[in-house]
Amino acid sequence: MARTHDDKWDLASSVGATATMVAAGRAMASRDPRGLIDDPFAEPLVRAVGVDFFIKMMDGEFDLSVLQNVSSAKAQAMVDGMAVRTKYFDDYFGDAIKSGIRQAVILASGLDARAYRLPWPADTVVYELDQPQVIEFKTNVLADLGAEPRATRRAIPIDLRGDWPVALRAAGLDTTAPTAWLAEGLLIYLPPEAQDRLFDNITALSAPGSTVATEFVPGIVDFDVDRARQMSGPFRDHGLDIDMSSLVYTGARNHVVDYLRAKGWDAEGVTRSELFERNGMAVPAPSDDDPLGEIIFISAALTG
């Protein structure tokens, strides 16, 4: 089903299921003996969502390499890719803490548990924004686990298509102090104009010294819808009904680095391949089966 301007979802369907998929990847990467990341909450959160495909994947009962055009090396690269992505954004927040930033905003937070697992200074406030049912689910599951946030956590149940800047201010965001923003795994699910509007709003709410991190997929401009639809077929055959071709917004859009620089941010990007090299992992071979291609991880600081 194609996206609409007011579509809804939970963590087992549509865009929400991709958040669960990402958390399953974090759970698997957390078991890796190389110890690149440690997210102890990812696995219990995925189990609580209850999507059988992801549970079997975490338990080793389903090997991704049985899927068409997915070799064992490619399956491992999927997990490694989640490891380097998670570490990049964990390190980003670590650098923000070291610089003295004491408020963080996680947009479309999904099953992100950084408020619970990162070593925040005691006076830090972490704001999380997502759809109401997603916020409620994660909050309740983590409470049932006895987990306690390691910072002051302020969860804001709002769709990012709504007036989230007003909601964020109402929740206590101090726009006179620097903020560390995170938009992880979000941009491909936004129309091009909504991507620009997101960074316009972030800029308007940010004091000098603020930072922002995200990832950008240049291949979304000429995204191969047919190939993505074909790739979704084998997943459906194994019980996972996610059709990426219907979830993402394709077409021309501004490059995030260029757009942020034009807004006064000092922005830099690093490719996923470079992150693999940086972390001592085998760089995946380029694949014609990947409808998105390379991913660029971006961090920026607001000057002035």
From Swiss-Prot:
Biological process, per Gene Ontology: methylation
Q: Where does S-adenosyl-L-methionine bind?
A: D130, D159, L160
Entry keyword annotation includes S-adenosyl-L-methionine: yes
MF GO annotations: methyltransferase activity
Record's keyword annotation contains Methyltransferase: yes
The coiled-coil regions, if any, are none
What UniProt keywords apply to this chain's record, in alphabetical order? Methyltransferase, S-adenosyl-L-methionine, Transferase
InterPro entries the UniProt entry points to: Ppm1/Ppm2/Tcmp (IPR007213), SAM-dependent_MTases_sf (IPR029063), SAM_mthyl_Trfase_ML2640-like (IPR011610)
Q: What class of enzyme is it?
A: transferase
Provide the E.C. number(s) assigned to this enzyme: 2.1.1.-
- PANTHER family assigned to the protein according to its UniProt record, in alphabetical order: S-ADENOSYL-L-METHIONINE-DEPENDENT METHYLTRANSFERASE YKTD-RELATED, S-ADENOSYL-L-METHIONINE-DEPENDENT METHYLTRANSFERASES SUPERFAMILY PROTEIN
Q: Which family does it belong to?
A: Belongs to the UPF0677 family.
Known function: Exhibits S-adenosyl-L-methionine-dependent methyltransferase activity.
Q: What is the protein name for this chain?
A: Putative S-adenosyl-L-methionine-dependent methyltransferase MMAR_1057
Q: Which organism is it from?
A: Mycobacterium marinum (strain ATCC BAA-535 / M)
Starting at the broadest rank, the lineage of the source organism is: Bacteria, Bacillati, Actinomycetota, Actinomycetes, Mycobacteriales
